[in-house]
Amino acid sequence: MPAILTHDFFGRDAYPVVADRLGLVTLDEHDAFLLGNQGPDPLFYLVADPRVDPSNRVGDLMHHVRPARLLASLRDALTMLARSERSVGEAYAAGFLCHYLLDSSVHPLVYANQYAICDAGIDGLDRSDATEVHAEIERDLDEMVLFSKAHQTVATYRPYREVLHASDRVLSTIDKLYFYMCLWTYSRTLELDCYTHAMKAFRQVQRLFWSPRQGKARLLGTVERSFGHRRYSLYCAMAHRDRADDHSPFANEGHLSWENPFTGEVGADSFWDIYDCAGGRVPAAVDAFFSTEFGETAAEDLTKNLNFSGQPTDPDGQEAPPEPSRDE
């Protein structure tokens, strides 16, 4: 998943055109749209809330399985909202669609970098470290995006203050969307306040992650490695650094050839090429999503059955597709 700041800035870039199309004018609608741009990522943070049953941790499932049906279910879930909730729900759904567009577009580049690093034959580094490598790549891109867009670093731009704003009323509306999305897509029943718990955990973890000088990151990273018996720290890989740089070695700014690890397609697009292309798809995608004809067939046309990783999937599959082998 491109990280929190990249998705937030993508949403801010897309907001004017989406607001114009949907007539979004209130602060709640604005906040709901930007939350939507985080997609199902907040559900990963349910692990930080022991009050929530583990059966609600469906973030990974949503990222990898039945993407077209998920979007069609989200569209249908809007009909279950009260009239007073509908505009907030539509704003969130439009943001969720933007999250999908960016995720499925940028992820092949992220995974190409990840597999290149993990498969490079470096002693003490292999695919068992993929989660930390993936997070490190996305953290670096996040820092680049922040400095490029806001000319700030996390020393002054604190993610836990600047991002994830929404009232409890907005979160309650989004809870209902997740309940119906998961029920209709995966036959899974979530707790009615699942998303609210996830978002509040996400906010708390972002505060914990804030370590611009990396002192807290080094301390907590050492604890994580020691008690988790891990070679590398996921906390250290995810904690933003005070890095005033609008470049990243993972952005392919030199337009070198790289291969999509999921399709074998070879291209030379940079991160910003892909970011801009995804942004260019937003108007037509929003128009299609909110048309009266939108259903699973139209969702398959929109997604091409690519999941949030940009990986082809079986539209009826119940398991995440396997990762590419080293020979592919």
Residue ranges and their predicted role:
Residues 1-95, 100-328:
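N-terminal leader/auxiliary helical segments
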